[in-house]
Structures are given as C-alpha cells and as structure tokens.
Amino acid sequence: MRFLLLNRFTLLLLLLVSPTPVLQAPTNLTDSGLDQEPFLYLVGRKKLLDAQYKCYDRIQQLPPYEGEGPYCNRTWDGWMCWDDTPAGVMSYQHCPDYFPDFDPTEKVSKYCDENGEWFRHPDSNRTWSNYTLCNAFTPDKLHNAYVLYYLALVGHSMSIAALIASMGIFLFFKNLSCQRVTLHKNMFLTYILNSIIIIIHLVEVVPNGDLVRRDPMHIFHHNTYMWTMQWELSPPLPLSAHEGKMDPHDSEVISCKILHFFHQYMMACNYFWMLCEGIYLHTLIVMAVFTEDQRLRWYYLLGWGFPIVPTIIHAITRAVYYNDNCWLSTETHLLYIIHGPVMAALVVNFFFLLNIVRVLVTKMRQTHEAEAYMYLKAVKATMVLVPLLGIQFVVFPWRPSNKVLGKIYDYLMHSLIHFQGFFVATIYCFCNHEVQVTLKRQWAQFKIQWSHRWGRRRRPTNRVVSAPRAVAFAEPGGLPIYICHQEPRNPPVSNNEGEEGTEMIPMNVIQQDSSA
C-alpha cells in the first residue's frame, strides 16, 4: 500500500520530470554500474520485477477459465497482469506507478476481440494494451500544475509578508510584550524560515532539470493530504540506466538535501511551537489557576530542540536506506520518523484545548465567570488554528476520483498548506482586538503630529489618546480580550497617563473588583 505522508511541502512540488522509462537495462551493466543508476530508477524497476513475478505466480495459481464461449488467456503484457477475459470485452486497470510520468489515477485498457484474441496494434501486429491515458503530462494537467506552482509561490510570499509585519508589531509596541507573545514570535519565525526555504526550493530546485530529471520524484504528496502525480514543466529528457546519472556527492545534490533537511526541521518546529502554545495555555488556565509566571526555557527546548532529533534520524536513515536525490520521494515509510511526532503533537494539542475549554466552561458556570470568559476569548485563536493547520493530516487523506472534485480538492488543499503562515499571522495578530486598538491609538497619535506639523489646531493629547485607553480592551458586553496576563509595572495615576505597561489591564483586575 502506497505510503501516506504528511509533508506540508509542500510540495506541491512541481518537479521538472519527464522521463521516458526504459524497462530493461543493458546486459553489459556491472554491479558497480548499477550503483550509479538513479535511485528511483532502481525503485521503479524493482516494482516492475515484483509485479511480473506476482503475475506469473497468479497465472499459475488461478483455476482454469469456467466461462462459456471464446475468451482471451491470462497474460503479462510487459507492464501489467491481465486475467482471462471473455471475447468482446474491454478490460480496465489503473495505470501502474513504476514511472514518474505515469498517472496512477488514470486507466489502462486492453481489448479482447470477438475471436478470443487480445487486440493487436495495426502498425506492429503485436498484442497491445492502451497506456496512452496514463500520460501525466497532458496539457490540462500541465496547466493545473502551473496554477498550483504559482499558488505556492504566492501563498508563501504572502505568508512571509504577513508574518514579518506581525513580528514588527509585536517588537515595536512594548505594551504587547509578554510570555505568550514571545511564544507567538518564535512560532512566526519558524513559519518565516520555512516559507523562505520552500520558495528557494521552488525557484532553484524545481526548474533545475539537470538535478531533478536525474532522479525523478513524485510531486504531490499522496499522504494524508497529498496525492502522487508527475508533471513536466520543461522539454522532455529520456531517462535510462545510463542517462541521468548524478554523483551522489555532487554539490547540487548535497545542497538540495541540506535544503530539504532544514525544511523538514522547520516544518516540525511549526507544529511543536503550536504545541507550546497549547501547553502554555493549559498550564496557565488548568494547572496554575490563572497565573502566568512560567519558565520559557522548557518551551524553547520543546519548540526548537526536540524537532532536530527526528529530523537528524530521518536524514541518516534516508541516506542509508532510501537515498534519492533531494530526499523528496514519498514512496518510503521513513517519513513517519518526522511526521509521526508531528501527528502526535497535533493530537496532544487537540486534547489540551478540549480540556481547557472544559475547565473554562466549568468556571464560567461557577466562579470567576468574567475572567474565565476572557481566557476563553484568549484561547479562541489557538482553538481555530490547531484544526486549521492539522486538517490536511486528518480530514483530507483521500483525493476524490471525480476530476472536478479532484481539482477543487487540489486548490483547497494547497491553499491550506501554502497560506498557513498568512493564517497564523492573521489570527494571532491582525484579528486580535488588543493589537487593533494599539494600532488605532498609534494612528491617532500620528494624525495629531501630522496635523500639528502643518499648523493645524492641536487638540489636547490626553483626550485623544486616553479615550482609546479607556476602551482599549473593551468588547461588546463589557468584557476585555487580552493577549497577555500580566501585572502592571507601576500603579496607574489619576490622569491615566502612566508608563506604557499600565495600559495592559491585568486579568485579575476583574476578580479583585468583584471581591471588593
């Protein structure tokens, strides 16, 4: 059964592959020559030999044909196995996956004529199976591949822009600084680095036919959210046992593998920093009874340190057991070394959030109703992002066979994958009420300064600025929403003009007021 991966590479990876498969290697190949063959060429040839062996075994094991009338004998056509077929019947099978330019979702046909003989091609007068639909490089598929390719570039570019803007906001406005924002900034950094790596891959590796064609890769992930398919984005080149050889120690091959190594590492960091967000909220709300004094070094260790372990193990095992160029093939279970921990992090985070919601709902029904409500609002962003970022691992393991639904699936799946950084920045920063109020306040101050510069009448600063402060974190219903839970750094003064830290209304104010 084909390996189902989880790799958010992205991979939509429209690799430039257009090999013409060669079924038989020259007879004069030596063992040393075989070692230099493209790795995935050997994998495809092994699949073909396995299928041939199973076919001949099946031909021997099946009972004789018991139908009436003429029929075509079971046979091996060189690529696939065909059972006994009644005369006048067209048999169909899915295309094989031996070759990167074959589309396994398409069908192969073989016709048994009325005389009980397999159809012969008029040009060669030899029995013939129709593999023409297996071509993965049809104009429609190429067009779809180009669209997905540019969708990935746009998605990661927008993600980088949105994440850098969010990082700038959190760094510039000191009143937004707290432990949870520190977690946000680290998670933003992982998404920025991951998007940069993917863009480099799409720009430098994908168009590099000399590198990619030498070891054809399956492009779209056929794992929980991907499906294997090959696309060609440049003129075809043949692939044989001798053509397309590339020294595994070539600098391009090494650079490509290093790039993929860091992509896998950053992808894992994405999800483990999301887990840090969930652990932080769970500790803050469930374990510590609404206290925020937590040591962040353990979060740094989990978010940056732990993902390097499975990434290194994957790199070593991949180099030893499945050393294809760039390590992009999804036809190996070794990818579970990385994606297993990622799935575990998503599951743990999901249960953390369920427990957080349970605790908050209980508190809202009993005591601390206002504060519990505010924490529930603070948890809302993580509650949205965890299923959003993990949906491709859980909800979309199967691509619809219908062509229209399949295209809708492709665009939806790739939008979720390649715009993840944009979603993270939007939900954690741009949609946060506290950030919006801070930006509005800054804009109001800018307009005052601009008006004063041009000689307009300057209105009293305390009236313009303090008004937003008074309602800075208020939402309909009178309950604020916060990024942070922190104590004021100095007592507020009567004119509401203290240090910037006093603008952060602490979470426990409501509890103190209610107990007074």
Curated annotation (Swiss-Prot):
InterPro entries: GPCR_2 (IPR050332), GPCR_2-like_7TM (IPR017981), GPCR_2_calcitonin_rcpt (IPR001688), GPCR_2_calcitonin_rcpt_fam (IPR003287), GPCR_2_extracell_dom_sf (IPR036445), GPCR_2_extracellular_dom (IPR001879), GPCR_2_secretin-like (IPR000832), GPCR_2_secretin-like_CS (IPR017983). GO terms for cellular component: acrosomal vesicle; amylin receptor complex 1; amylin receptor complex 2; amylin receptor complex 3; axon; cilium; neuronal cell body; plasma membrane. Residues 489-516 are annotated as: Disordered. Residues 170-181, 280-296, 358-377, 432-516 are cytoplasmic. Glycans are attached at N28, N73, N125, N130. The chain crosses the membrane at residues 147-169, 182-202, 257-279, 297-317, 334-357, 378-396, 405-431. One of its GO terms (biological process) is regulation of mRNA stability. It comes from the Eukaryota. Residues 25-146, 203-256, 318-333, 397-404 are extracellular. It is a multi-pass membrane protein. Residues 1-24 form the signal peptide. It is found in: Cell membrane. One of its GO terms (molecular function) is calcitonin binding. Keywords: Cell membrane, Disulfide bond, G-protein coupled receptor, Glycoprotein, Membrane, Receptor, Signal, Transducer, Transmembrane, Transmembrane helix. Disulfide bonds join C55-C81, C72-C112, C95-C134, C256-C326. Belongs to the G-protein coupled receptor 2 family. G protein-coupled receptor activated by ligand peptides amylin (IAPP), calcitonin (CT/CALCA) and calcitonin gene-related peptide type 1 (CGRP1/CALCA). CALCR interacts with receptor-activity-modifying proteins RAMP1, 2 and 3 to form receptor complexes AMYR1, 2 and 3, respectively. IAPP, CT and CGRP1 activate CALCR and AMYRs with distinct modes of receptor activation resulting in specific phenotypes. Ligand binding causes a conformation change that triggers signaling via guanine nucleotide-binding proteins (G proteins) and modulates the activity of downstream effectors. Heterodimer of CALCR and RAMP1, RAMP2 or RAMP3; the receptor complexes function as AMYR1, AMYR2 and AMYR3 receptors, respectively, and respond to amylin/IAPP, calcitonin/CT and CGRP1 ligands. Interacts with GPRASP2. This is Calcitonin receptor. The gene is Calcr.
